A protein has these predicted regions:
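Surface-exposed, low-hydrophobicity beta-strand/loop segments enriched in small/polar/acidic residues
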Residues: 1-179, 183, 190, 208-221, ...
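Ser/Thr- and Asn-enriched, surface-exposed coil loops between beta-strands
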Residues: 184-195, 226-235
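Disulfide-braced loops of extracellular cysteine-rich modules
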Residues: 198-200
Length: 276
């Protein structure tokens, strides 16, 4: 069975709620300022200023100012004078009745793409679950109307600071890419030597090994620096939890998407201080 290929980030896509709550896909409408001069794309994070929606930069967090995620808008087209429903808000549109459709439930679980830089798709890993991640504030696509914001693949140990915008809840198995395997040779601190890799390893690649009985052993680590096909070594973010056995088979998987939630204190509904 062919699974979908993830070629680019798309911002935050709501899929569920935490705690087994019923997810109805409900949204709330907020006004967009007349002539608001910034594009807002489907999947962008937004906040409120004086009752109006504003697009937020999300790189390292926006403590207490997040209202939700933009999921389209409607407005009267100033040229045709017809009501228009759109995937994104075109900057500087002169419409006085513009409203944004926003997923504002602070318990929403989102799906998002992991990138190493700009829109370069990288990987998530099991070791990232429970950690906080920064995001990459990319410019969206006016042709599709979709956001291009992405999760930033961490280097070394994922950060724990509460200033970062999202918490990783899980992996998305539907789009995992099983890259293949290599034979383990040795390790020095976190640099692993192995047989020549027949494939490239993106940042964040999940690494495990096979036990003598055929069981899979998660390493609790991920690839820290991208490695090219043909390389005979790669660097982990940390030494594996369980040491690799001599000449064991190393297994590599790329998870381009992760499940995340807006961090506590980022969403204005979970912050006691009101917006300005």
């Amino acid at each position: 069975m062919a699974y979908p290929v993830v070629n680019a980030p798309y911002g935050l896509k709501p899929i569920n709620l935490i705690g087994g709550q019923v997810f109805a896909g409900s949204t709330r409408e907020y006004a967009i300022p007349y002539g608001y001069a910034t594009n807002i794309f489907y999947g962008d994070i937004v906040g409120l200023t004086r009752g109006n929606v504003q697009r937020l930069s999300v790189s390292t967090g926006t403590l207490g100012t997040v209202t939700g995620v933009f999921l389209g808008c409607s407005y009267t087209n100033p040229t045709t004078k017809q009501k228009q429903f759109a995937q994104y808000w075109p900057a500087s549109t002169l419409a006085g009745d513009a409203v944004a459709i926003v997923c504002d439930d602070p318990d929403t679980v989102f799906k998002a793409v992991v990138c190493s830089a700009t829109t370069v798709v990288a990987s998530g890993a099991r070791a990232m679950i429970g950690q906080n991640l920064a995001m990459i504030n990319n410019t969206g696509n006016v042709n599709t109307g979709d956001s291009a914001n992405a999760l930033l693949a961490p280097s070394d140990t994922p950060a724990t600071t509460d200033a970062l915008p999202v918490r990783v809840l899980g992996l998305v198995p539907d789009t995992v890419v099983t890259l293949g395997s290599a034979t383990y040779t040795s390790i020095s601190t976190a640099t692993v030597t192995c047989s020549a890799l027949p494939f490239a390893l993106p940042v964040g690649t999940d690494v495990g090994s096979l036990a003598a009985n055929g069981q899979y052993i998660p390493s609790g680590s991920f690839v820290d620096t991208a490695a090219s096909a043909g390389a005979t070594s790669f660097i982990l973010n940390q030494a594996p939890v369980t040491a690799f056995a001599s000449s064991s088979t190393l297994v590599f998987a790329q998870y381009p998407e992760l499940l995340v939630k807006l961090n506590f204190g980022q969403h204005q509904y979970y912050a006691a201080t009101s917006i300005a």
